From Swiss-Prot:
Keywords: Acyltransferase, Amino-acid biosynthesis, CBS domain, Cytoplasm, Methionine biosynthesis, Repeat, Transferase. It comes from Methanobrevibacter ruminantium (strain ATCC 35063 / DSM 1093 / JCM 13430 / OCM 146 / M1) (Methanobacterium ruminantium). This is Homoserine O-acetyltransferase. It is found in: Cytoplasm. HAMAP family: MetX_acyltransf (MF_00296). PANTHER family: HOMOSERINE O-ACETYLTRANSFERASE. One of its GO terms (cellular component) is cytoplasm. It holds the Pfam family CBS.
Length: 490
């Protein structure tokens, strides 16, 4: 599958004309949101997808800024031929309220004082971020989104969208996140905040325009956070216990290990692009996030109407699989249409930003709903039920296949025989095909989604499914190899 970048892009600014009322009861004036768009909005305005960024992300999700050395943060899935195909969809991403990459936040000018807000900026929530995004979507003339998609804190925003504005999207893809922040997640954020607040140059948030800023505290906060984005396995693979630019231990407090050097690099790079006060405000918004009502998640989600996709990462210990499954259970309890997938990766939490093939496959299947008809093989060798086992072996050998659908004279599916069945027939001294074939065979329809049949094949440990019509007549087959090839094409 041929893929391209969206190319050169520019960040735009949307100004909210009226006051923005916040969850705290306070209001903000002159709010601006930085945003980028990719692709074209169709005439009916039905092809828009909102992408929500994670904690330290921004509006630059794809493409290249002028003189940039790297593309947007989700380049792997946004662009022509990718899951968020900009030849098909109009993709929108905005910097969150409280951010520092063009949207109004604590580093912005307070219209009442003509100075930076600093700690006069009100506490914000994920709900406030989404409320501001809604105004942007309305400004773009979009009444209903095709989908809202987000990972990590972006997944929280996507979830909040489904609760706050249930009629404004068809689909929601919720990735590597939770429906309510856990004590451990809150604890990590608090340690990060304290590292900033304890920096002597934080100066109670009043460091704008000064020569010294809380760079050290913000760098440590980033180092702490970055550890949670990785997995133990990924750190072993990337660093092991290798030393950094030395052959032996130094026996002092300089950097010995590569992993130490890496974390320092992450911290030093981060302070060049992020505001310390924004980090305080955004992590507090994450801590406050809880969609349950009186402890009940189903009660908090009872009004959602979107079709859901939940994607977890098997090595994610920041937002572990169990939290995604809690969300899945709550939605299933409500009878909401929902699918669940786990990305297999050593990368940890950051896998949703890095696993090109798996993320494109899962998102593409959900957003575009690829169906069996797109992949199935129609030129399929079959065998008559009255044939012998030797006949089956010859057909398999001649056609280099391991599965043979068994059909009658009208091509009606009667069963399936596999190479494994033929092996068993030798041990049991069977002669007739009917004695070894599977009669109660699982099958699918050409209109079934690839996502659905992938789950079925995994659940029942099946590598091949016959495809039948409404009369149970054979139309073709689909195999796990074909699905794997689709994944590898991204």
């Amino acid at each position: 599958m041929k893929q391209h970048s969206v190319g050169r892009v520019e960040t735009k600014t949307f100004a909210i004309n009226d006051k923005l009322k916040l969850s705290s009861g306070k209001t903000l004036e002159n709010v601006e949101l930085a945003y980028e768009t990719y692709g074209e909005l169709n005439t009916a305005k039905t092809n828009a997808i909102l992408v929500c960024h994670a904690l330290t992300g921004d509006a630059h999700a794809a493409g290249w800024h002028k003189n940039a050395t790297k593309p947007g943060w989700w380049e792997i899935v946004i662009g022509p031929g990718k899951a968020l195909d900009t030849d098909k969809y109009f993709v929108i991403c905005s910097n969150v309220l409280g951010g520092c990459k063009g949207s109004t936040g604590p580093a912005s000018i307070n219209p009442k004082t003509n100075e930076e807000y600093a700690l006069d900026f009100p506490i914000i929530t994920i709900e406030d971020m989404v409320h501001a995004q809604k105004k942007l979507i309305e400004h773009l003339g979009i009444e209903k989104l095709h989908a809202v998609v987000g990972g990590s804190m972006g997944g929280m925003q996507a979830l909040q969208w489904t609760v706050s504005y249930p009629n404004m999207m068809k689909k929601a893809s919720i990735i590597a996140t939770t429906a309510r922040s856990s004590p451990q997640q809150i604890a990590f954020n608090e340690v990060g905040r304290q590292s900033i607040i304890s920096d002597p140059f934080w100066n109670n948030g009043q460091y704008y325009g000064k020569n010294r800023t809380p760079r050290s505290g913000l760098a440590v906060a980033r180092m702490i956070g970055h550890i949670t984005y990785l997995s133990d396995e990924s750190m072993y693979i990337k660093f092991g216990r290798e030393l950094q630019d030395k052959d032996q231990l130094s026996y002092d407090f300089t950097l010995d290990f590569q992993v130490e050097s890496y974390l320092h690099h992450q911290g030093e790079s981060f302070v060049k692009r992020f505001d310390a006060n924004s980090y305080l405000y955004i992590t507090k918004a994450v801590d406050y996030f809880d969609l349950s009502v009186d402890g009940s998640l189903p009660d908090g989600l009872k009004n959602v109407k979107a079709k859901f996709q939940i994607i977890a990462v098997d090595s994610d210990w920041l937002y572990p699989v169990d939290q995604s499954k809690d969300l899945l259970t709550a939605l299933q309890t409500l009878g909401v249409e929902v699918s669940y997938n786990e990305v297999k990766s050593d990368y940890g939490h950051d896998a949703f930003l890095l696993e090109n093939g798996q993320m494109n496959f899962l998102l593409n299947n959900f957003l575009s709903e690829n169906v069996v008809d797109d992949l199935m093989k129609t030129d399929v060798p079959t065998i008559d039920i009255n044939s012998t086992i030797k006949d089956a072996a010859n057909i398999m050998f001649d056609n280099q296949v391991t599965h043979l659908p068994v059909v009658d004279e009208n091509d009606k599916l009667l069963g399936i025989v596999t190479a494994w069945d033929l092996s068993k027939s030798i041990a049991k001294d069977c002669k007739l095909l009917e004695d070894v074939m599977t009669k109660d065979v699982r099958y699918c329809k050409s209109t079934d989604s690839i996502e659905y049949i992938s789950r079925q094949m995994k659940k029942f440990d099946i590598s091949c499914l016959p495809v039948v019509n409404d009369d149970l007549c054979l139309e073709g087959i689909i195999t796990t190899d074909q699905i794997s090839h689709l994944i590898s094409s991204y």
